[in-house]
Amino acid sequence: MSSHQNFLTPPPDHSKAILAVAVGVGLAIVLHFSLSYKLPSPGDNIHSLPFGGTYRDGTKSIIYNSPHRGPGQSGALPIITVFAIIECTLHVLRKRDNPVRPQHSDCPNCS
């Protein structure tokens, strides 16, 4: 017999490496789709104004507003709406968790 002993060892754990790769790929996908602008941009083949703006030269003048907002709309309205919905949801959940119970007094004449 040989003096070399074979010990049983568990297989290497690759879960942390797989988790790191999955997080990296997920972050790359989210960044790619959040930073790419897919809407058609106004303008001509030389002057592109995808986020609105103005351009003026000797022969032409271009004025485009932002594609998401008109000239009279506020940019804070969606944020305020989200906060209002969250607040209403929390209010309803608080009311559901703490229902109003009638007050019972210890007075025998009041019951």
Swiss-Prot record:
Residues 38-72 are lumenal. The chain crosses the membrane at residues 17-37, 73-93. It is found in: Host endoplasmic reticulum membrane. The keyword Membrane applies. GO terms for cellular component: host cell endoplasmic reticulum membrane; membrane. Its main location: host cell. Keywords: Host endoplasmic reticulum, Host membrane, Membrane, Transmembrane, Transmembrane helix, Transport, Viral movement protein. Pfam families: Plant_vir_prot. GO terms for biological process: transport of virus in host, cell to cell. It comes from the Viruses. Residues 1-16, 94-111 are cytoplasmic. Plays a role in viral cell-to-cell propagation, by facilitating genome transport to neighboring plant cells through plasmosdesmata,. Belongs to the Tymovirales TGBp2 protein family. TGBp1, TGBp2 and TGBp3 seem to act together for cell-to-cell propagation. TGBp1 is the main movement protein that physically cross the plasmodesma with the viral genome. TGBp2 and TGBp3 would facilitate TGBp1 function. This is Movement protein TGB2. The lineage of its organism: Viruses, Riboviria, Orthornavirae, Kitrinoviricota, Alsuviricetes.
